[in-house]
């Protein structure tokens, strides 16, 4: 198993990063939240999980070991593959998923693309004794609410966009962030900002 990759960020895409390790570019699938912490040309270290299939080897990257562990635990539930597990972590931080499972919060799980009401109920049953109790801060996105503009702007600059483009994209998604109330999700805002920029080009 490849436990982590450490090296220079050679490229960034909406759903992946390329980390140069010893002259080799390692393509790593990441959530928008993880990608928002990376900068082109800067050193980075990502916890990783290698998913082996008959026709492919896919490396998934995470901000820390806890996120990777939750990613792997999610896949122990029937019907959850690496893509759905990553989608769950793109919408919710590890502690938010633990809290959702611990409290039986179907709505939190159905917020993930690909999970319906019945699927959420099944996951709540299967994951109840696997994820454990929340271990971190009390609320998902709580530290993000005041600084989402700075985080989103930095993420867009890290993806190679000009300062002017980043400014315009941040302004374009501001109504969406305000509609989310006190806990805007930077990952979701990054996706919306990238769509805005792609339409403008």
UniProtKB/Swiss-Prot annotation:
It comes from the Bacteria. GO terms for biological process: DNA recombination; DNA repair; SOS response. Its main location: cytoplasm. One of its GO terms (cellular component) is cytoplasm. Belongs to the RuvA family. The keyword Cytoplasm applies. Residues 1-63 are annotated as: Domain I. GO terms for molecular function: ATP binding; four-way junction DNA binding; four-way junction helicase activity. Homotetramer. Forms an RuvA(8)-RuvB(12)-Holliday junction (HJ) complex. HJ DNA is sandwiched between 2 RuvA tetramers; dsDNA enters through RuvA and exits via RuvB. An RuvB hexamer assembles on each DNA strand where it exits the tetramer. Each RuvB hexamer is contacted by two RuvA subunits (via domain III) on 2 adjacent RuvB subunits; this complex drives branch migration. In the full resolvosome a probable DNA-RuvA(4)-RuvB(12)-RuvC(2) complex forms which resolves the HJ. Has three domains with a flexible linker between the domains II and III and assumes an 'L' shape. Domain III is highly mobile and contacts RuvB. The keyword Cytoplasm applies. Residues 139-143 are annotated as: Flexible linker. The RuvA-RuvB-RuvC complex processes Holliday junction (HJ) DNA during genetic recombination and DNA repair, while the RuvA-RuvB complex plays an important role in the rescue of blocked DNA replication forks via replication fork reversal (RFR). RuvA specifically binds to HJ cruciform DNA, conferring on it an open structure. The RuvB hexamer acts as an ATP-dependent pump, pulling dsDNA into and through the RuvAB complex. HJ branch migration allows RuvC to scan DNA until it finds its consensus sequence, where it cleaves and resolves the cruciform DNA. It holds the Pfam family RuvA_N. This is Holliday junction branch migration complex subunit RuvA. Keywords: Cytoplasm, DNA damage, DNA recombination, DNA repair, DNA-binding. SMART domains: HhH1. It is found in: Cytoplasm. The gene is ruvA. Residues 64-139 are annotated as: Domain II. Residues 144-201 are annotated as: Domain III.
